[in-house]
């Protein structure tokens, strides 16, 4: 699984614009035409991506994360961000036009691409078939984000 964190998101984590303990963090399911897996420069808001390629299956909706945790991992010398519950996209119609490639995590501001702030793109280890009626991103298996000593 590969992740891409926009440079602006790194700055926003440091300056407090994105607070992983208190911000409303959401997940957006994206399909295989996304550019979220390659773009990290000059991505300040969601509308700065060339193509997000949001899931287009009937019944699709972004998911608000719940049970977010930020912990210091002294054993592995890093900080971890995760959720205590899986991220589950339910009620999908099984009729998307392309397979699912990953999730785009973002800070919800007002529900518009012009103002919502990207956090990270998390790629699945393999594409999920477009016929899926539910997509589950497991929690606490690899952590959603990790900050390590350089």
Language-model region placement:
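Small cysteine-rich, disulfide-bonded extracellular modules of the LU/uPAR three-finger superfamily
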Residues: 1-101, 108-150
């Amino acid at each position: 699984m590969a992740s891409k964190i926009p440079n602006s998101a790194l700055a926003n984590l440091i300056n407090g614009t994105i607070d992983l303990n208190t911000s409303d963090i959401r997940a957006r399911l994206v399909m295989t035409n996304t550019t979220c897996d390659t773009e990290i420069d000059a991505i300040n808001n969601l509308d700065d991506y060339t193509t997000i390629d949001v899931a287009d299956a009937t019944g699709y909706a972004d998911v608000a994360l719940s049970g977010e945790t930020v912990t210091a991992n002294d054993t592995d010398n890093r900080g971890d961000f995760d959720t205590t519950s899986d991220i589950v996209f339910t009620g999908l119609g099984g009729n998307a036009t392309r397979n699912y490639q990953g999730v785009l995590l973002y800070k919800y501001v007002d529900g518009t691409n012009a103002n919502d702030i990207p956090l990270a793109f998390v790629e699945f280890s393999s594409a999920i078939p477009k016929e899926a009626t539910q997509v589950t991103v497991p929690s606490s298996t690899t952590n959603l984000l990790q900050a390590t000593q350089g």
